[in-house]
């Protein structure tokens, strides 16, 4: 029987790109979107068994919709450069796979798909991540809607569409005509949202019926509909897919031959997608038997469900001493081998069964260091919630992958498995994934980083998350009242200068007030019009008294909403805030704090520092803070080997004053405060590869002067320049850079065709060895601190950049301060001293 598969290629490519970011071939060319697209295609071919396939693409040229409405898709961001580069490569590969590409200037892929779906009467599946195509559903056409990137597909037919509240497929168009579509910038009727649009359609059936009855609809809603009739009809036309596109395509043109040809296989191998060849069938001459396939580990398994405690006990008794793979979610998945998956079902029945606590209590005693999990810290929290403890430290493939793939995170098993050359979708793949990653870990010289730093750190972070930090809600309430009062005062003053009330938080309305009404001269535009960002407003600071008020309003509003109100919501029943530390999120190796983020509390403003007053010690305890001094500059001295920089630190000189003396050509005694501030900007700017233009902007000086400062800096510290240039050259040659502890960061940016991306890559290559090493050192310090605090009352609570915060009994303050200082200063031996500042108090503000 004939079966047609229509691919909305641009939509699928976008989803694949964001599902597999950062994937590159051995030459640094981006391939993640192509890999994801072809992975999905392999699954579709296997499951849907199409006899005909067409891949529809959008073209750059404007369509009839753009000619009809200039704002159509005007708010869309341009396609990322790394994705643009993959489009022609994908098109060639699609052709090599024997699939017809269909595109036509003036029309979108949706229109081509709609035309083909209506032209042929055979069963048809449209594969897309765009809900517009739901209007094409009929008796022979379904839509396979992609969700969660590329890992989940939902089949939509008339019945499923009805379940979502749409009586007919055409109701999708009516809905968009009323509500609009932000992604395509289809306006709809202003002021009508999702709920109102659905209620109107439920009452009146169609958009035209809504408009016809507008006079009967009372209040503001009726007024909106009457005023928006023309916009609704325009939106209806924009949202309607054209099913009569003039394309000369017949069924014979889109016939799909399967198994694939030899050239298709060679095309996949040429793109280094050897693992994907195992997911397609090829013609007899090159069919590869699974027994002889060494390119990819393909996992096949049977599933066994366990729903009672006796069977669970028997499972572990029968496999006593064997390592197992474990993944805990809604259910708990266990595998002792790759060919059998045990799904342990929770049962909340009042009359018996197993709860999650029962399951975890049974599993915990069997956990060993040879077991494999995907997120150890998360598992430790589940065990804690179940009231059980384990001293075992199993292998963590999430952490392994993060190190092996240079700081990349993985959202699910499928994408992680694909990266590890394994074809699988369950915990049964964990052993094969782990084997692959451990070999890569060894070959990339990352074993010590994993075993000695990252893996043991998971328990330290778990303990910190459990401990949390006490928050004085009274301080937050005081600050909330203070900030709300100031916002009210600022608002009144801003309205007075503006001569009218308006939404101060609306860039559009603010633009009208500043540039149209008050006549200020704009200095910058963005894609949606004139910019009113902080940079623009600061340049206008002296032009009108309203500007300082707006800047202050934004500052206080941010403090109130993000920090004061955000922290109030985050306080747990124990009166403490328990942040979560993400260990595999950043590509520098630095930890990331979330829910709430305690690492971005501002420290440079008086108001920002005030918020730290809310973080307090328990009664009878103190908070002790220890902070590395200029750690990245000290690392620059050590890693560059520059004698002048090393000497300055060994002699405990004021490094910023020393640099100022050199770049200004004055005696150090004659360095002014302004000179020192400028030198400080140079010192820290150099670490991040700052340009003369960037330094000139930071210091508000001429570019020529900034260039002189940088040249004098490199004359003073010549090996710094050699080191930075050397890192860029190493990255170009090897595709990555390393820290002192061998952490790697992949550098695909350096092979980008985009100049700005390449320049960013150069700066990242210069900075990562320093910032990444600083991250490694603070982690080592955390491990030493946690170990050395054993036997005391103290607990490590927070890590914020280069700072550690500990809570201790007041009578142990001096002892703990000494432990903290020594643990941090001896974390690693450098050619310059690591200096740590230690302070204590009843609050983080005082410490």
Where are these regions (language model features)?
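Non-catalytic, usually N-terminal nucleic-acid engagement modules in DNA/RNA processing proteins
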Residues: 1-54, 58, 65
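Short alpha-helix plus adjacent loop in nuclease-associated cores
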Residues: 17-20, 71-85, 139-167, 222-223, ...
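Extended two-metal-dependent nuclease catalytic cores across DNA- and RNA-processing enzymes
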Residues: 21-24, 74-246
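Conserved DEDDh/DEDDy metal-dependent 3′-5′ exonuclease domain
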Residues: 52-54, 105-108, 129, 302-316, ...
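Conserved "right-hand" nucleotidyltransferase catalytic core of DNA-directed polymerases
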Residues: 228-352, 423, 429-603, 622, ...
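Function-dense linear segments that define catalytic or interfacial modules
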Residues: 335-338, 401-424, 429-430, 583-667
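Conserved catalytic core of nucleic-acid polymerases
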Residues: 466, 578-579, 584-586, 661-792, ...
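C-terminal polymerase-core module
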Residues: 485-492, 496-547, 715-763, 767, ...
């Amino acid at each position: 029987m004939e079966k047609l598969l229509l691919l909305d290629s641009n939509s699928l490519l976008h989803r694949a790109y964001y599902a597999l970011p950062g994937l590159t071939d051995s030459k640094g060319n981006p391939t993640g979107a192509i890999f994801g697209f072809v992975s999905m295609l392999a699954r579709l071919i296997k499951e849907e068994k199409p006899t005909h396939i067409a891949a529809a693409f959008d073209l750059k040229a404007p369509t009839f919709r753009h000619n009809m409405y200039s704002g159509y898709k005007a708010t869309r961001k341009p396609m990322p450069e790394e994705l643009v580069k993959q489009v022609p490569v994908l098109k060639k590969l699609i052709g090599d796979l024997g699939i017809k590409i269909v595109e036509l200037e003036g029309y979108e892929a949706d229109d081509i798909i709609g035309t083909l779906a209506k032209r042929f009467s055979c069963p048809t599946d449209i594969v897309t991540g765009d809900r517009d195509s739901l209007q094409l559903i009929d008796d022979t056409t379904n839509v396979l809607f992609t969700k969660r990137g590329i890992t989940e597909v939902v089949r939509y037919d008339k019945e499923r569409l009805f379940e979502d509240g749409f009586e007919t497929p055409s109701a999708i168009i009516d809905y968009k005509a009323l509500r609009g579509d932000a992604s395509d910038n289809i306006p709809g009727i202003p002021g009508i949202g999702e709920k109102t649009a659905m209620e109107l359609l439920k009452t009146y059936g169609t958009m035209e019926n809504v408009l016809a009855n507008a006079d009967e609809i009372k209040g503001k809603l009726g007024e909106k509909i009457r005023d928006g009739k023309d916009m609704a009809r325009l939106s209806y036309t924009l949202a309607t897919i054209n099913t009569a596109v003039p394309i000369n395509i017949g069924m014979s043109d889109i016939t799909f031959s399967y198994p694939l040809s030899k050239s298709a296989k060679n095309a996949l191998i040429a793109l280094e997608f050897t693992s994907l060849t195992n997911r397609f069938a090829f013609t007899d001459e090159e069919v590869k038997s699974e027994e002889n396939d060494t390119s990819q580990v393909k996992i096949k398994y049977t599933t066994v469900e366990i729903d009672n405690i006796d069977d669970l006990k028997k499972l572990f008794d029968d496999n006593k001493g064997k390592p197992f793979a474990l993944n805990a979610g809604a259910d708990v998945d266990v595998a002792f081998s790759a060919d059998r998956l045990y799904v342990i079902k929770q049962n909340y029945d009042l009359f018996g069964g197993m709860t999650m606590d029962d399951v975890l209590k049974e599993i915990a005693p069997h956990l060993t260091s040879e077991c494999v999990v995907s997120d150890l810290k998360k598992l430790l929290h589940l065990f804690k919630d179940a009231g059980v403890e384990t001293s075992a430290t199993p292998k963590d493939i999430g952490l392994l992958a993060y190190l092996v793939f240079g700081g990349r995170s993985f959202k699910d098993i499928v994408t992680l498995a694909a990266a590890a050359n394994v074809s699988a979708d369950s915990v049964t793949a964990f052993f094969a994934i782990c084997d692959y990653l451990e070999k890569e870990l060894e070959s990339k010289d990352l074993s010590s980083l994993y075993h000695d730093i990252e893996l043991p750190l998971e328990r330290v972070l778990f303990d910190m998350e459990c401990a949390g930090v006490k928050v004085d809600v009274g301080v937050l309430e005081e600050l909330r009242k203070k900030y709300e009062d100031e916002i009210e005062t600022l608002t009144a003053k801003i309205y007075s200068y503006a001569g009218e009330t308006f939404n101060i938080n609306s860039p559009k309305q603010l633009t009208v007030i500043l540039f149209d009404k008050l006549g200020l001269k704009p200095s910058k535009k963005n894609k949606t019009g004139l910019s009113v960002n902080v940079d623009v407003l600061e340049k206008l600071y002296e032009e009108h008294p309203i500007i300082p008020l707006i800047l202050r309003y934004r500052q206080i509003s941010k403090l109130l909403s993000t920090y004061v109100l955000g922290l109030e919501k985050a306080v747990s029943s124990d009166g403490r805030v328990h942040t979560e530390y993400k260990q595999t999120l950043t590509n520098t190796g630095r930890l990331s704090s979330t829910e709430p983020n305690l690492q971005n509390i501002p420290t440079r403003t008086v108001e920002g520092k005030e918020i730290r007053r809310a973080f307090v010690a328990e009664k009878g305890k103190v908070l002790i803070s220890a902070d590395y001094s200029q750690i990245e500059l000290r690392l620059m001295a050590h890693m560059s080997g520059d004698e002048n920089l090393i000497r300055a630190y060994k002699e405990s000189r004021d490094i910023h004053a020393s640099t100022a003396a050199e770049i200004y050509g004055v005696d150090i005694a004659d360095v002014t405060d302004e000179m020192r501030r400028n030198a400080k900007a140079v010192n820290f700017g150099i670490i991040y590869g700052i340009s003369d233009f960037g330094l000139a902007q930071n210091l508000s000086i001429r570019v020529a002067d900034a260039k002189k400062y940088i040249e004098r800096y490199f004359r003073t510290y010549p090996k710094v320049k050699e080191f930075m240039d050397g890192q860029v050259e190493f990255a170009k040659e090897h595709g990555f850079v390393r820290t002192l502890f061998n952490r790697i960061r992949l550098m695909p940016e350096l092979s980008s065709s985009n100049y700005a991306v390449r320049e960013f890559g150069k700066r990242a290559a210069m900075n990562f060895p320093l910032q990444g090493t600083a991250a490694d050192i603070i982690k080592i310090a955390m491990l030493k601190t946690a170990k050395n605090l054993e036997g005391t009352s103290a607990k490590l609570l927070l890590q914020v950049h280069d700072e550690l915060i500990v809570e201790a009994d007041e009578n142990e303050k001096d002892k703990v301060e000494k432990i903290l200082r020594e643990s941090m200063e001896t974390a690693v031996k450098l050619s310059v001293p690591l200096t740590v500042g230690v302070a204590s108090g009843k609050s983080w503000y005082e410490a």
